[in-house]
Amino acid sequence: MRCLAARVNYKTLIIICALFTLVTVLLWNKCSSDKAIQFPRHLSSGFRVDGLEKRSAASESNHYANHIAKQQSEEAFPQEQQKAPPVVGGFNSNGGSKVLGLKYEEIDCLINDEHTIKGRREGNEVFLPFTWVEKYFDVYGKVVQYDGYDRFEFSHSYSKVYAQRSPYHPDGVFMSFEGYNVEVRDRVKCISGVEGVPLSTQWGPQGYFYPIQIAQYGLSHYSKNLTEKPPHIEVYETAEDRDRNIRPNEWTVPKGCFMASVADKSRSTNVKQFIAPETSEGVSLQLGNTKDFIISFDLKLLTNGSVSVVLETTEKNQLFTVHYVSNTQLIAFRDRDIYYGIGPRTSWSTVTRDLVTDLRKGVGLSNTKAVKPTKIMPKKVVRLIAKGKGFLDNITISTTAHMAAFFAASDWLVRNQDEKGGWPIMVTRKLGEGFKSLEPGWYSAMAQGQAISTLVRAYLLTKDYVFLSSALRATAPYKFPSEQHGVKAVFMNKHDWYEEYPTTPSSFVLNGFMYSLIGLYDLKETAGETLGKEARSLYERGMESLKAMLPLYDTGSGTIYDLRHFMLGIAPNLARWDYHTTHINQLQLLSTIDESPIFKEFVKRWKSYLKGSRAKHN
């Protein structure tokens, strides 16, 4: 400083210091005004993390109707995320939650003169927490990330409408059922080893066969078979020495057991005969498949016996064994052993099992209405073990076996149709307050319709008249009112309606009625002019009713599930979004087989409700 003072006079020095001080003050003020505001990223204060998917049910998707409450109808499909440009000034995911240039202050928000919540004010704008918005307006949102940036995505609804294919045909894909996964629903206890179809626990933890679920199981696998590529099939045993297409795996035959290839005249082929006491290790075939998990084998037992499959799993690589036993026990789980009864199997039959489903249903077994969630999955099909005395043939593992599942459902429907043409539902159903309970043995028009759609497809594939005959007899309950053990109701003494739930008073459920009409359409188109006459008459009367009554289900912002508000004089039963999209999907299908403009008009309007549109007010 002394050196500087010696060279510069004091006036100049004072001016320099003053300028320096001024610059410092200006810079300080600028830094203060540009300071970044911390924008809340803690989702509990404004954003919801969980996705729009509710996932299995209407769906049947969701868990796929609570595979979503997961009971979402499986009409909704997860859509592939598309690349999007980052939001300008958005959140930086690299630890930064600062948004430059924003100023806000906390403000009290009085809601309907009832209670107060905290909001944020920025100039003339006021922002409310999304956790409040989503509950108040019943809307949906989630934070997603694109190229390192977070973006909030808002949706008025959670369910999607599928794109209608070309005109609907009775031998084609059934609606969007290729997206249904009935067996993974938590209200499906398991796939019965004896019957080969799902056992439901929706209205009772004991489990019961629900015709709607069984028909949907068949229709979903039929539709998947049409839309998916053919499965990869690995053949492990055909008992034919000359068959070079099979894997050269050897059987292990412990002491005291027997295994040989023998001729079977009834099949005109060789088969594998085995004798292995229950107390032995059993004869075993190494498999080692790590890609596919649908196992199939032909089996004939001469005594009590079992076929077991050892699986290496994702549960710390532990081995679990699924036993298919010649009894009628439904399912059991002990330690790491899962048991399914498959019946006596004293004549040749094919056993086809989804090892993923069988493993997960076993590990998740509970005494409640829902299977316990589990993350366990098979990693490898290690080996097959046979015990008892009997024969095996055609051991394969494949990617899928859709037609086996479809025909399991079709055959069950034929075997379990009663003398009145219906599939009685053997569980009590209470639809709601004001309705009398439906006691075990009731019919459902939705079950009749979807069963007909299943049987028609089985007939068209096989030309086996037993399927068509069963479908024709299934029209009988359509003709009788609920008081006479039928499914028919009449609205305002004029419009015939086929009840999903034939309650007293009538409930007029919309989606079940439309499924019943689709079944009648499939039958009238397949059976021909003479045999299909009754189905045609029932279908035409039902379509007249639908066209007349459709406006009753429109709220101006969504749809109504049934007409209990009219029949009971209570609040309307609004359709969840997955049921709303089911209504749209059904109308889309009907619009391809009926040229009435009403269907396309309602489809257009009901689709707009999914994006928040509302009918005009006065």
UniProtKB/Swiss-Prot annotation:
Its EC number is 5.1.3.17. GO terms for molecular function: calcium ion binding; heparosan-N-sulfate-glucuronate 5-epimerase activity; protein homodimerization activity; racemase and epimerase activity, acting on carbohydrates and derivatives; UDP-glucuronate 5'-epimerase activity. Disruption phenotype: Perinatal lethality. Pups die shortly after birth, apparently from respiratory failure. Mice show immature lung structure, lack kidneys, have abnormally small thymus and spleen, defects in inguinal lymph node development and in blood vessel formation proximal to the inguinal lymph nodes, and display important skeletal deficiencies. Mutant mice have heparan and heparin chains that are deficient in iduronic acid residues, and that therefore have altered O-sulfation patterns. Keywords: Calcium, Golgi apparatus, Isomerase, Membrane, Metal-binding, Signal-anchor, Transmembrane, Transmembrane helix. Widely expressed with highest levels in lung and lowest levels in spleen. Pathway: Glycan metabolism; heparan sulfate biosynthesis; Glycan metabolism; heparin biosynthesis. GO terms for cellular component: Golgi apparatus; Golgi membrane. Belongs to the D-glucuronyl C5-epimerase family. PANTHER family: D-GLUCURONYL C5-EPIMERASE. This is D-glucuronyl C5-epimerase. It comes from Mus musculus (Mouse).
